[in-house]
Amino acid sequence: MPLVIADRVLETTTTTGNGTVTLAGAETGYQSFSVIGNGNTTYYTIAVNGGTDWEVGIGTYTSSGTTLSRDVVLDSSNSGALVSFGSGTKQVFVTYPADKAVYLDASGVPSGNIATTGKAVITALVFGL
């Protein structure tokens, strides 16, 4: 199951507790989690509108039942553990967690945590030679 990231993916849920969330459909102007693909993983955020409960993690999308499992919590309002969400509507969206990000700094140099598995080709700029 590959890790898939897509732009403008936002759904809502009324699921309570700390288990798998049932997705209620895309918000107007956004894509649904179906673009992630059945059985694929993605980075997600669950947040209560106007509230203090939130969670960022890695989850697996399942098209039958349109659910997102909460497999790994990367950060949360519950000291990095699963959040037990109460009643009400929560937003669920695809995100790109800061601690997983690799980006170019203001000088165009790659920054962030860079790790590879298997074969990798790295091209670098060398300054001061």
Regions from the PLM with identified roles:
Residues 48, 62, 105:
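Acidic surface patches and DE-rich sequence motifs
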Residues 46, 70-73:
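Generic short beta-strand segments
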Residues 53-69:
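Elongated alpha-helical scaffolds
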Residues 33-58:
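Ser/Thr/Gly-rich low-complexity blocks that favor extended beta-strand/coil architectures
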Residues 1-30, 65, 73-129:
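Glycine-rich, low-complexity segments
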